[in-house]
Amino acid sequence: MVGEFEIKDEDLAGRIGIIETKSGKLETPVFFPVINPFKSEISIKDIENLGFKNLITNAYLIKKITNTKIQDIHSFLQFNGVIMTDSGAYQILQYGNIEVTNREIVEYERDINTDIAVYLDLPTGDTNSRDEAINSVKITLERAKEIEDIVKNDSERIWVHPIQGGRFLDLVEYSAIEADKNEAFKMLALGSPTVVMEKYDYSLLIDMVFIAKSNVSRGKPFHLFGGGLPHIMPLVIALGVDSFDSASYILYARDNRYITRSRVYRLEELEYFPCSCPICLKYTPKELLELPKEERTKLLALHNLYVIKEELNAIKQAIREGRLFEYIQEKAYSHPAVYSAFKKILKYKDYLEKYDPRVKGNIRGIFLFDLKSLNRPEIVRHYNFLDRINKNNDKAIIICEKRENILKKVKNNENVDIYLFNPFYGLIPINLIEVYPYFQTEYPEEIDEDVLRYIESKIVEFVRSKGYTKIDFIGCEKYLSHINSIGAFFS
């Protein structure tokens, strides 16, 4: 059925899913290249040949420029894949107004037989005026009600309800809650992030996505308008974004900007291409610069699309393997703005833990590196577990030696609770040492001091809260610098 969304795999709050449309199934996370059919630097066939089975175009511009009745958008674009149409809201953001009503453009999108359609919302944009933001939320919600009769009677399309509010997070929350209530709309989308992303204000973007996602149903696919840079994609996918659209690939190409999975370069800055796509294998940066403008733009645009597709595939693989946290941790060091976004995500670790699957089909080892790793769901879950357990005895032994030596140490110890020390999990009850994820965890040989200090504090907090009267430590001098004082406190 059109609009059905089946989740196939999950990691953190991100997921791989299948959206059912009348023109076929879409696997998410998915990127919709923005297409302007009236500019020919790169053809739809070129994009299709890269493996893209979907695109987005502007219904308002097509209506305005053609000035004729189009029977079918697929025939007009000569594209049989999934077509999403925007309504002209971006033009409102740019120019302040457009010459079409909400109902007119919605009827037009229906009549040209698009697959996924957006009604004419009013973008909040990057305004600092709360009154303007309130007005954009109010009008966006009103316009959804205005065309609800069309949407409810249209079973062939997925209709998208935008969420507005901009930098005013309480308005984003209200807009998200109200949008989610409207069951006629099978897809939700966060509007107005384009300017935020252009300014590299990724920390605010993370807040906006989190607030929106945490207040809507997990059963509806969630779209991010304007999300076209690979280095931010995995972070918002980790929060639950399922699809993106952007013209960045062509806009950047026109400006000689070269997208990589970690950052954006100006073509003039490069001596070597850090990529092995067909374009980068054939040309050097110098050779590409010497080509005519139109040809260079096309080739750069194709490269940029290759990179976006490659990034999405890497993210999906990370989700499959349960390594999305490790992946975004690695991505964080690509740019200071991305690092700020990663730090902001860590503040939402309880949200990530809530939706992260406890165990996946193929159990894989997890990698822990530094203090940031303590925010991944497995660690959060472990400390929540420690909070819930009760002591069985008044005395406890904490063993810091290698696993293979543990059984010898505890053989004759009865009437005592025994824990294995781990520099990231803190304390692991002895009967769980071979349970996932403890036995499947890898970490550096040398542990950062800030990690050890944090773990020491967690151990003190744990033994105090459980009411142990005596604690013995075995082989812990290497890890716990204040071990003597800790032991004395509980002896």
UniProtKB/Swiss-Prot annotation:
Belongs to the archaeosine tRNA-ribosyltransferase family. PANTHER family: QUEUINE TRNA-RIBOSYLTRANSFERASE. Its cofactor is Zn(2+). InterPro entries: ArchSynthase1/Queuine_TRR, TGT-like_sf, TgtA, tRNA_ribo_trans-like. It is an enzyme of class 2 (transferase). Exchanges the guanine residue with 7-cyano-7-deazaguanine (preQ0) at position 15 in the dihydrouridine loop (D-loop) of archaeal tRNAs. Pathway: tRNA modification; archaeosine-tRNA biosynthesis. SUPFAM superfamilies: Pre-PUA domain, tRNA-guanine transglycosylase. The active site is at D86. One of its GO terms (molecular function) is pentosyltransferase activity. It catalyses: guanosine(15) in tRNA + 7-cyano-7-deazaguanine = 7-cyano-7-carbaguanosine(15) in tRNA + guanine. Gene3D superfamilies: Queuine tRNA-ribosyltransferase-like. Keywords: Glycosyltransferase, Metal-binding, Transferase, tRNA processing, Zinc. Its EC number is 2.4.2.48. Binds 1 zinc ion per subunit. One of its GO terms (cellular component) is cytoplasm. Zn(2+) binds at C275, C277, C280. This is tRNA-guanine(15) transglycosylase. GO terms for biological process: tRNA wobble guanine modification.
